[in-house]
A protein has these predicted regions:
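An extracytoplasmic/periplasmic, membrane-proximal ligand-sensing/linker region
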Residues: 38-41, 181, 187, 192, ...
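Ligand-binding "clamshell"
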Residues: 105-132, 213-215, 227-240
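A bilobed periplasmic-binding-protein/Venus flytrap-type ligand-binding module shared by bacterial periplasmic
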Residues: 141-151, 246-259
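Bacterial N-terminal signal peptides that target proteins for export
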Residues: 1-10
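Sec/Tat signal peptide C-region and signal peptidase I cleavage site
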Residues: 20-24
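Beta->alpha turn/N-cap motifs
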Residues: 78-79, 89-101, 117-118, 145-146, ...
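Bilobed "Venus flytrap"/periplasmic-binding protein-like clamshell domains
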Residues: 41-71, 136-209, 288-292
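Alpha-to-beta junction loops
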Residues: 87-96, 165-168, 185, 207-221
């Protein structure tokens, strides 16, 4: 089973690299404009992992169905790359994760609940950038271990790692080294100092493989990843609320917002559920394309 899921996870990466859409699509940030000169086109960007790419495709297709010209720039990179792109006009719209975005913008943020995070994020966004209505759907960060590791060290919560962290290697994306929702927060809030940190991908096939092969003993995975259940992995309970609510939310350039855009993306957010994300991520892992999965989800919810 683990082998099959690893193959599927590898497919995730291939999909991310080879995805094409029926919409106009450009290379991520290649020849990016210095300002928003074309007010008729909305450029939808994504981070460099499949769920973000899928959500960007859903947004773009939903808007296109309402007669709005769209382009996609998928797999731009991490928040440290695409947030400046949103500010400089290279992109106009991003599917975002509310809590992570808030933490990026406000290093001292303490909001945790969906309502508190949304309120704080509204205030924290830079001038010219706005958030639309958040979805109830969430994809939360987590610290995952194998069942064997959990049983060996009697781990149920992140706090349970403290006596043994010095024996364990932690895996995660490179930006976890400097993010509050990463090594910094694990040390400050939980007192964890791991043996070492191994830079991997963003909860993708490299992370999964490293965890299953015991190259790392704890790793950053996301709650909507179908590989968690398929590989009998354990997400340790975050009893000190290190990871804030991660509701999916459209974040976009204020200059591109109008009634049609707002109503369209609000309808997408209202229809989207956490279960939908798990199911759609599973389909991507089984080689379905972003276009096909997005189109079928929109059709199911009569949004195209």
């Amino acid at each position: 089973m683990a082998f099959n899921i690893l193959k599927a996870a590898g497919a995730f990466a291939l999909i991310a690299l080879s995805a094409t859409t029926t919409l106009a699509q450009t290379d991520p940030l290649g020849n990016a404009p210095a300002q928003r000169s074309d007010t008729s086109t909305i450029i939808v960007g994504s981070a460099d992992f499949p769920e973000s790419q899928l959500l960007a495709t859903i947004y773009a297709k939903a808007l296109a169905a309402k007669g709005i010209k769209t382009e996609t720039k998928l797999s731009i990179g991490s928040r440290e790359v695409y947030m400046p792109a949103l500010l400089d006009g290279s992109i106009d719209l991003m599917p975002e994760y509310a809590g992570a975005t808030l933490s990026y913008l406000d290093k001292n943020a303490t909001a945790h609940s969906p309502a508190d995070v949304a309120a704080a994020l509204t205030k924290a966004l830079p001038e010219g950038v706005v958030m639309l209505t958040p979805s109830a759907a969430q994809d939360s960060d987590g610290v995952a271990v194998t069942r064997a590791t959990a049983e060996k060290y009697k781990l149920k919560t992140i706090a349970d790692l403290k006596p043994v962290a010095s024996e364990l290697v932690l895996g995660g994306p490179p930006e976890w080294k400097t993010r509050k929702e990463g090594i910094i927060g694990l040390k400050e809030l939980y007192g964890l100092e791991f043996k070492s940190f191994k830079s991997l991908d963003v909860g993708g096939p490299l992370t999964l493989s490293a965890l299953l092969n015991d190259q790392v003993q704890a790793a950053n995975l996301f709650s909507t990843d179908p590989a968690i259940a398929a590989n009998d992995l354990i997400i340790l309970e975050d009893i000190k609320n290190l990871f804030p609510a991660q509701n999916i939310v459209p974040v976009m350039a204020k200059a591109k917002v109008n009634d049609t855009v707002t109503k369209t993306l609000d309808a997408v957010s209202a229809a989207l559920t956490t279960k939908d994300l798990i199911v759609m991520n599973g389909r991507l892992a089984n080689h379905d394309s972003f276009d096909v999965v997005a189109e079928e989800w929109l059709t199911t919810h009569k949004l195209n």
